[in-house]
């Protein structure tokens, strides 16, 4: 009988919570014992009442003491595999749920028929982490404790990959006025557009939002929510709009996060949100790493003086607890010494990093090449750098066939970036938990980076921070 498969994943770190996944005729109930596992369900027409009825409901429910805290569903046609309607039909609708004691995040990928290596099974994940993650640094290194006398570099920090690309708002302001002349300019700056040379300009112009969505939108949460989840490291690529974009849009003339030349969050807004969080959480820190990897030359970059001025202006917004900013020298200083000075916004520019990412390895739909990169990293490799970065997300959009297929079949929840999110996390995050501290023992800060930041990623960084800040850390065998 016709059926459509759904792979389901969950992560739970708050006691008393369970996640139920169901389709007609079948139910899966996950607890924390099922973290980092993949399970499968089938919307099978044989379980759908009615001779010519093919549509069945896939639903997940978050339960606490048998009470339903939240739920979401999609109605799936078992004959075509398509999602006909539901509450998870567009990525922009996947808003986190904040309860009295937990933060729930989730995602759903609408799969096609398994073309170009992509999965033919819909993908759904749900994660539940503690609201206490908002104050985790104060918990693992309380003021006055022995842990807080250790260098800041002992922290392991979770990072939202391309955090400034969490919305299409800036892009939509440009695309609303884009024409074929705009497209001609964009072809010069966005090499992946050559993959669509077979399309007439008017059709490519129509598809442009889908191209950008598949290339660049790697987050879906606002910065305050990322911070509440426990993210503490943010790479930012500030630059002004391309001249042609300035002419087209009514966006303010200021510095934006840039993905090549695709604009995201404004830098001043980003800094203001960081300081607002630090002002309300006096034991917490944030690291901002300013870089310009891949930013096209036509996008004007801020000078160091301008960066300093924007940092000063942002820090001046603090009302309750002083917030000062510092540089890479803060990494080697005791945590409590930084707290006493109020130096809790650490900003580095083009710092040296020891990074797992390479273009070749990460152009993948599976975890194996990424795990091989992890396996090759050593303590010796860390020594000459400021930061060690373990990237969990694939850049499958750099595979021509994958990007083209995702764009041409685009719906609101079909970005190729979402197709691998949950499956990769079930392999990369457990590897990091088991092996990172054994393999990487230099006195350097470690960063765990991921797309669509979630509780499983942030909890990983918190647990490793707790281990690295243990008084007997240097004597342990991992």
Model-derived features: positions:
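Long, acidic (Asp/Glu-rich), low-complexity accessory segments flanking structured domains
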Residues: 2-229, 242-280, 285, 395-478
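Substrate-binding cleft and catalytic face of glycoside hydrolase catalytic domains
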Residues: 235-243
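Intrinsically disordered, low-complexity acidic segments that are enriched in bulky aromatics
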Residues: 258-322
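Active-site beta-loop-alpha junctions enriched in small/polar residues
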Residues: 160, 239, 291-295, 350-352, ...
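Aromatic-lined glycan-binding groove of carbohydrate-active enzymes
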Residues: 341-419
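Structural recognition of the beta-strand scaffold that forms the well-ordered cores
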Residues: 154-157, 232-236, 286-290, 345-349, ...
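N-terminal cap/leader regions of alpha/beta-hydrolase-fold enzymes
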Residues: 216, 226-229, 235, 300, ...
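A Trp-anchored, charged/polar loop motif used as the substrate-binding/catalytic surface
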Residues: 214-220, 267-276, 317-339, 363-381, ...
């Amino acid at each position: 009988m016709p059926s459509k498969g759904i792979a389901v994943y969950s992560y739970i770190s708050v006691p008393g919570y369970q996640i139920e996944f169901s389709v007609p005729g079948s139910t899966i109930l996950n607890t924390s014992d099922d973290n980092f596992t993949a399970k499968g369900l089938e919307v099978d027409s044989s379980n759908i009442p009615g001779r010519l009825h093919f549509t069945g409901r896939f639903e997940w429910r978050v339960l606490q003491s048998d009470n339903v805290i939240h739920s979401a569903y999609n109605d799936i046609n078992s004959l075509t595999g398509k999602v006909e309607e539901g509450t998870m039909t567009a990525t922009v609708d996947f808003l986190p749920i904040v309860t009295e004691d937990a933060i729930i995040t989730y995602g759903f990928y609408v799969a096609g028929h398994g073309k170009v290596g992509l999965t033919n099974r819909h993908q759904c994940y749900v994660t539940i982490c503690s609201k206490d993650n908002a104050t985790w640094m104060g918990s693992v290194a309380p003021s006055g404790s022995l842990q807080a006398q250790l260098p800041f570099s002992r922290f392991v920090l979770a990072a939202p990959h391309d955090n400034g690309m969490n919305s299409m708002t800036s892009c939509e302001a440009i695309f609303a006025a884009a024409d074929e002349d705009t497209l001609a300019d964009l072809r010069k700056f966005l090499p992946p557009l050559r993959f669509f040379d077979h399309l007439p300009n008017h059709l490519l112009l129509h598809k442009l939002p889908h191209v950008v969505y598949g290339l660049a939108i790697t987050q879906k949460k606002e910065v305050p929510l990322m911070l509440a989840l426990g993210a503490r490291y943010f790479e930012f690529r500030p630059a002004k709009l391309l001249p042609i974009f300035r002419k087209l849009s009514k966006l303010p003339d200021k510095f934006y996060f840039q993905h090549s030349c695709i604009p995201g969050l404004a830098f001043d807004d980003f800094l203001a949100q960081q300081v607002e969080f630090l002002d309300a959480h006096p034991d917490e820190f944030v690291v901002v790493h300013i870089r310009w990897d891949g930013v096209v030359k036509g996008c004007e970059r801020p000078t160091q003086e301008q960066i300093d001025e924007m940092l000063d202006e942002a820090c001046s917004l603090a009302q309750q607890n002083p917030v000062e900013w510092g540089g890479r020298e803060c990494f080697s200083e005791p945590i409590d010494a930084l707290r006493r000075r109020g130096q809790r916004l650490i900003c580095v520019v083009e710092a040296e990093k020891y990074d797992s990412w390479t273009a070749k390895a990460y152009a993948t739909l599976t975890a194996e090449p990424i795990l091989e990169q992890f396996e090759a990293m050593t303590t010796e490799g860390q020594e000459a750098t400021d930061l060690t970065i373990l990237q969990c997300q694939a850049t499958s959009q750099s595979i021509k066939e994958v990007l083209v297929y995702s764009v041409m079949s685009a719906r609101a929840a079909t970005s190729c970036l979402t197709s691998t999110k949950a499956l990769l996390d079930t392999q990369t995050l457990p590897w990091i938990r088991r092996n990172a501290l054994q393999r990487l023992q230099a006195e350097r800060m470690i960063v765990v980076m991921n797309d669509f930041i979630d509780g499983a990623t942030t909890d990983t960084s918190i647990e490793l921070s707790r281990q690295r800040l243990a008084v007997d850390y240097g004597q342990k065998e991992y």
